[in-house]
């Protein structure tokens, strides 16, 4: 892959074309895909992220009968990325999940089981199961926008016997 060192940058048109062909050949060796993972720490906030870049020349591996964003693709638990964080304005827990392949027509559901596990389902497939600290938590909102699920989970109210 090209480096950011100015002395390594091609200067002429032929050098630039040569470097481009080399880069495309490297991508071709990797089936046109690059994957990575990284973490950013900002004070008390930690962000883990994954990325995948795919470059091709128009030849799609999908068959013509399988449209992009098929709900079957969304059930792959390996591609679902989940992040949890405390809400800034309440005691709620916010769960954000990247669900590739989910469309507006795809059934997405979440439930808190009696065991305290939060399950996220796409269609009939459970794509993620998270253990919650409080088994009495309640899901107060569920939205899916652009293949991103956002859940707000509220802790159970303390009963009169807990005080």
From Swiss-Prot:
Q: What's its job? A: A minor component of the gas vesicle, also found in soluble extracts. Proteins GvpF to GvpM might be involved in nucleating gas vesicle formation. Gas vesicles are hollow, gas filled proteinaceous nanostructures found in several microbial planktonic microorganisms. They allow positioning of halobacteria at the optimal depth for growth in the poorly aerated, shallow brine pools of their habitat. Expression of 2 c-vac DNA fragments containing 2 divergently transcribed regions (gvpE-gvpF-gvpG-gvpH-gvpI-gvpJ-gvpK-gvpL-gvpM and gvpA-gvpC-gvpN-gvpO) allows H.volcanii to produce gas vesicles.
Compositional bias, Basic and acidic residues, is annotated for 78-88
Domain of life the protein comes from: Archaea
Q: Which UniProt keywords apply?
A: Cytoplasm, Gas vesicle, Plasmid
Question: What's the short name of a Pfam family annotated to this entry?
Answer: GvpH
Extra remark beyond the main annotation:
Encoded in a 14-gene locus called c-vac which produces cylindrical gas vesicles only in the stationary growth phase.
Give the record's family classification: Belongs to the gas vesicle GvpH family.
Q: Does the keyword Cytoplasm apply?
A: yes
Full protein name: Gas vesicle protein H2
The gene coding this protein? gvpH2
GO cellular component labels: cytoplasm; gas vesicle
Record organism: Halobacterium salinarum (strain ATCC 700922 / JCM 11081 / NRC-1)
Which InterPro entries does this chain map to?
GvpH
Q: Which stretches of sequence are listed as region Disordered?
A: 57-92
State which residue ranges cross the membrane: none
Major site of localization recorded for this protein: other
Q: Report if keyword Cell cycle is assigned.
A: no
Q: How does it assemble?
A: GvpF to GvpM interact with each other in vitro, and may form multi-subunit complex(es). Interacts with GvpC. Might interact with GvpA.
Q: What induces it?
A: In PHH4 (a deletion of the p-vac locus) transcribed in all growth phases, maximal expression in mid-stationary phase. An unstable 6kb transcript able to cover gvpD-gvpE-gvpF-gvpG-gvpH-gvpI-gvpJ-gvpK-gvpL-gvpM is detected, as well as smaller transcripts. Gas vesicles appear earlier when grown in static culture, possibly due to O(2)-limitation.
Name its cellular compartments. Answer: Gas vesicle; Cytoplasm
